[in-house]
Amino acid sequence: MAAITFTRKAAAELKERFQLSLEEAFANEADPLKKERLDQALSKLERCFLGTVHSFCAALLRERPVEAGVDPSFEELEELDDALLRKRAWDEYLLWVQVNKPEALAELEKIGCEPADLFTFFETILTYPDVEIVREAVPEPDLSQVKDELIHFLDWAKTLLPAQVPPKGWDALQELIRKGDRHRRVFDLNDPLQLIRLLNELDRKPKAVKNRWDDKDNAESVEAAFEDLKDRFLIPALQQWREYCHYILVSSVLPAVESYQNLKAEKSKLNFQDLLLQTASLLKENPEVRRYFQKRFTHLLVDEFQDTDPVQTEILFYLTGEELTEKDWRQLTPKPGSLFVVGDPKQSIYRFRRADIDIYNEVKRLLKQKGGRVLTLTTNFRSVKAVGRWINGVFKGVFPEEADQYQAAFAPLDTVRDDETGCLSGVRRFTLPKVKRHKISEIVEMNAEQIACFIQKGLNGCYKLCRTPEERQHGLTDIPQPGDFMILLRYKDSMDVYTRALEKRNIPYQIAGGSGFTESQEMRDILKVFQAVLDQEDPVRLLAALRSQFFGIS
């Protein structure tokens, strides 16, 4: 059996809970035959795999390195180390280009691109190595026609603008015409870069506000003419220019990609994406290896399936599909009982990593088509009924009744925990008094005080919380503890305001997922002291340090 989850923390918890469950079942089992089976399961626990998909792929590659074409002693490249290696490969490549291939830099300069601007493109290619890069040389486009048409339009449109600024200011179309006219008077539009910069500025959808024109017909005429200019000349010219630049950019970046791959090979390192791609290739191209691992892992369980990307999905189907020689994973039929996945499409938040609801829905469709069963879990064991009622009422109007390619369907929660009499439950709202001019700093201060005061009342026993049987077994009472509270902020820049409100009441707290510690007043004051020590000739920094809380000289 192999059980795969998304994070190392979740994998560690899964291992612990699985072993404890087996031990508890073994201790409580009276049937000799079942007890013997549980004993065997415990003794052979190491034969199961419980971990992340990347560690699972690493284990498969280490077991069949020859067929995979990898160094048997390869090491996994952690994300931080991988980022450092990418930066090293990029810096070394740029240095090599400056010394050995200055004409490549001249090509980039010709299209208005600095080498440093390409690092993000370089990283994107490395992140998706399975995506084929289009690399086709395109001649430099002739921009003379779009330049002439643009100048003609600006000359004509300018004459229809009001002589004075309208009372409510220029509308978006008027402002765009004025900006275009200024640009062509300051810069030489015979320079392709200056012309392209202007075309990019004009690639907008400005609307004319008729009451800001001397004649409403003029507003309509100019708006229609601008749309025609865009559709017939501006957009095609920009498209041709981008196609021309694309080949130059790709040609500039691919050698750096090769340099990075060589550095990895020299060190026998595989990053997370390599582990996935190498494993998918190993299983796709080797039916015998596929058969071997299918015998080894007869049952595959996958948690957090909504976080699975196309390559990971491919691996799952290769490991469970009956057709050993079929290379298209979509044509594979998982063996009955071999694949079990759990996922919540409403938690699909990794689209930037190609793990989105499209993959989830496609796998769901394929499994149903191949005879699999889809079970919807609606029972909520964590929340009390007051929370469930509120959630159902809010999200019924947010999610569609039927799932589509963009969004999961609404599924009402069936909460089983009852609200306890005398205990606080449900969703409440803090109401703030009206703040003059809606000054955000004052609103944040008041909100922080409200929340900290509410927490302090709970710690003092002014209200009680519902507890689960497990919480009571661990010694928790109805009286709230500091760990019962979580403050979620939309913006982290106000985090220090909330921490100060908690500190004022001696309420312990922990910051997660933010930079509040480095942005705190204490850290800013420490930085001022260090800056004064570093630059002792700067009187401004010295004064800032002396006025900090460490010296307190006003």
Name these PLM-found stretches.
Residues M1-L20, L80, L84, R88, ...:
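Conserved motor-region signature of P-loop NTPase helicases/translocases
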Residues L22-N190, L270, L339-F340, T431:
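Conserved ATP-dependent motor core of P-loop NTPases, especially the RecA-like helicase ATPase domain
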Residues K34, N286-P287, P334, E362:
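Catalytic cores of nucleotide-enabled group-transfer and carboxylate-activating enzymes in metabolic
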Residues L45-A59, K110-D130, L249-P255, Q273-L275, ...:
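Core structural elements
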Residues G51-C57, S251-T298, Q312, E322-L324, ...:
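Conserved helicase/translocase P-loop NTPase motor core
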Residues G69-E75, Y260-A265, V374-L377, K434-S441:
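Short hinge/gating elements
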Residues A116-L270, G371-G372, P469-Q473, V497, ...:
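Conserved ATP-driven helicase/translocase motor core recognized via long
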Residues L300-V302:
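Walker B beta-strand of ABC/ABC-like P-loop ATPase nucleotide-binding domains
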